[in-house]
Amino acid sequence: MSAYANKRFLVIDDLPLARESLRAIAQSVGAFAVEFASNYQDALYRIRNNTPDVILCDYMLGDGRSGQQLLEELRRFGLLSDDTIFMMVTGEQAYEQVVAAVELVPDDYIIKPFSPDKLLLRLDRISAKKKFFAGYYREKRRQDYAAALAVLARNKEDEAGRPYRFEILRQEAEAHLASGNAGAAEAAYRSILTDYEFPWARAGVARSLHRQNRHVEARAEIEQVVAGTPSYFDAADLKASICMAQGEHAEAQRVLDEVARKTPRNFLRKRLLAEAATLNGDAETARAALADVIANDSMPGAVSPADQLALARSQVAAGDSIAAEKVLLGLRESEVKGFDLALQASYVALLALTSPERGAPRLAGLRPALLDTELPTDTRIDVLRAALAGADAELAERQARSLMAGPEAKKVFALLRKAYTLHGRDADLREIQRQVALERIHHEPTAGAGPAAA
Amino acid sequence: MHRLLDILASGVHDAKNQLFAAESMIATAEKAHGVDLGEARYAIEAAAGRLSRTLTTYRLLRHGASLAVVPTVVADLCEEVLLAQAKQLERAGVRLGLACSVLDEWPLDRDLVGDILNNAVQNAGRHARSRVELSAVLEGGDLVLRVEDDGPGFADPSTAAAGGTGLLVGERLAALHVRRGRSGALLLCNGGRLGGAVFELRLP
């Protein structure tokens, strides 16, 4: 009896002939239960409801979707268990170029036509590999990164790990990055690069530098990747994020515009585009992108209150208070009560901007908390705008100071200036800027002591 | 220029889907009736391989061709060549041996290198008396993949590469594998361990 007799297979392909062929091959390796999915949504639905053991997914799914996008979405929502085998099936070389470049790869990919024997060989190898990394996956899932790294260190010494030496290094880098140790991740990616110039490893260096707020270096690294592998869209996303951190919002939007056009149904990218457009002052593009996300990102739970707030924010920026108010009031009161402080603050600040009589009293209620709590950047900007509109100079100044002193100062400076200019208070912002700069100089000797002593 | 490549690629893609359908029907029939139709499946795979290779040749011989380099387990790559070719060679009375002493992963274009090795083994099988051997070893920091046979050898190894498309692609493919400033090479000679033709792909 075949080792795959009791396994549940899912075949994903939009073409009936190809689907039938994949099923026949799966059955000839002994698979008893073979299910079909004919499109992206159907595949997501089946995988969510009853995760198969083996997924054979064609790279081209039609309707502007690809198997790679499905894989990314499954990982993003944690819908693939560690034991599930995801095998990409491809008829042409386009996918090989993708898999050679990207960070997120399937367990394997196979080129049509292939014999049942070849499929069996590949499945057996994937199973062996999963078994080898089982201990690591377990710790990673529990987010115990120290333990996960300890397992990898043992794997490295293990003779059985020799066929996986790049995979071990790659996982090591990812675990460092996930645990927040961007410096160690950078070193791990660089050690891969001394062996071979993989685009995903170069992008990993850029990502690690970006996390360390070393944006100029990160930018140089990612430009190299984007130039060398134009089909590596995640690299373009990363480049855009770095550009935003550097305050180069027009370039960020240009890059995202270009890749978003090639991947019209990638809604994470659309959100990023909206962020760049907002920072770039192009409220119309931001609004269109977010409306598309909210209407079409059909993954259950994918559209979050944060998306609704982002849409309202872009409408406020576009000067369309009525539409923004409609979005905000569309959120149920019970839902708003369940928000954390940051989301609540954004909600009431945006409401205060669109409908002062409703929003201002609620903003006043949150005011004490907002004066001395750490808040995310988006929220700070919302609060700052509402405070300026409500002539609450102290609340506005508190937000502006934190933003100017923080790592995202370059990213948000243009927005801050615009907000202050709108209320004719440029002088206030210049004064805040001066004070933050003075404080920075004041703190420099202590900040510089580390490297100097070393 | 890119447009022409897209048209060719899409035609090859469709044809391969059809061939895959044919292969899967044969596999179903084999299972249902307990027969071995391996030869028919082999012919289908060979046709698909030929189509791919034609496209690859066109792609690689243009300017600006790029590889898809992935970490590849060398032993697995060799094993797949064995799986694809051993039975067919056996039918012609030729035994295909495998000797792989490389345990690690190697950065290479898995599918193109696999294709070139399949092609080399097929060629060797046509000229061998009774044996073909595929081997993988590390030599001076290079991965060396060799296909040797016990046939009469190349008439003139120095001009052999100009004769066949497969060899031409092999040369280009080897040259495109660049690592730490060094590039790969394709070498042809006579002699070797089996006394016949030797096809050697060296990858840095």
What are the language-model segments listed below?
Chain B
Residues 3-7, 19-49:
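Histidine phosphotransfer helical core of two-component systems
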Residues 38-92:
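Conserved DHp (HisKA) dimerization/phosphotransfer helix of two-component histidine kinases, i.e.
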Residues 95-104:
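Conserved catalytic submotifs in the C-terminal HATPase_c
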Residues 116, 120:
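Hydrophobic residues in the alpha-helical elements that line and stabilize the ATP-binding pocket
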Residues 123-125:
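Short helix-loop "hinge" at the ATP-lid/N-box region of the Bergerat-fold HATPase_c
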Residues 131-141:
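Short beta-strand/loop element within the Bergerat-fold HATPase_c
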Residues 146-168:
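Glycine-rich/acidic phosphate-handling loop/turn and adjacent ATP-lid/helix
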Residues 176-192:
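Glycine-rich ATP-binding loops of the HATPase_c
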